[in-house]
Amino acid sequence: MLAVVLNYLGREPRSAKREDLAAASELLKAIRPYVRKFQSQPVTELVNENLCVSLGYSGDVIQAQRTAEAAGKHLDFQYRVPRQGTTVWMDTMAIPADARHPEYAYRFINFVMRPANMAAISNFTGYPTASAKARQAVDPRMRDNPDIYLDEATYARLIPGRDIPQADMQARMRVWTRFKTAQD
């Protein structure tokens, strides 16, 4: 969340500079009276109409829409990438260097990477796939949604992840904790 705030302010999203964190803290302080809840699993809260806006993942929005439709609720959830950009993440698979049976891990990864399986995972989870071949079998409501499968201009506004040193992470966490606990 702090990366999004810093990016909105035109600052380096992974910064831990005192002046950047102070600016982010001031902005967060200004919006704090309007924040009612912090929660990392918004699907149920959205479907139960306990939230009017949520900062979350594209797949959460698709899952909320599916859940609402299954419950017979006529709700319309939409996912948007802020014009200033937002953080990007992706799932990855890795094999530990000391894995006892790396050949099985390779077989599993190869299985998952098959286009039909990638499409099935994408259709089930509501998250996009990076596989162009799999994309052909993705539900058209997802595949044709420009807020899920981003164009190049939108993709260019995404903030890539990178490691943040522990001391910097602690400084950033202090800002976030003060915001969540409504401390000045």
Task: Enumerate the predicted regions with their spans.
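Extracytoplasmic ligand-binding site segments that recognize negatively charged/polar headgroups
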Residues: 1-50, 64
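Periplasmic-binding protein-like
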Residues: 3, 21-29, 73-97
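A bilobed periplasmic-binding-protein/Venus flytrap-type ligand-binding module shared by bacterial periplasmic
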Residues: 6-11, 89-101, 120
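Short, hydrophobic alpha-helical packing/hinge segments within bilobed ligand-binding/sensory domains
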Residues: 42-43, 51, 105, 118
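Conserved C-terminal helix/tail region of periplasmic/extracytoplasmic solute-binding proteins
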Residues: 44, 152-184
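Loop/turn elements at helix/coil->beta-strand transitions in domains of secreted/extracellular proteins
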Residues: 49-52, 74-76, 104-105
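A ligand-binding cleft/hinge motif common to bilobed small-molecule-binding domains
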Residues: 53-73
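Mature extracytoplasmic/periplasmic domains
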Residues: 96-156
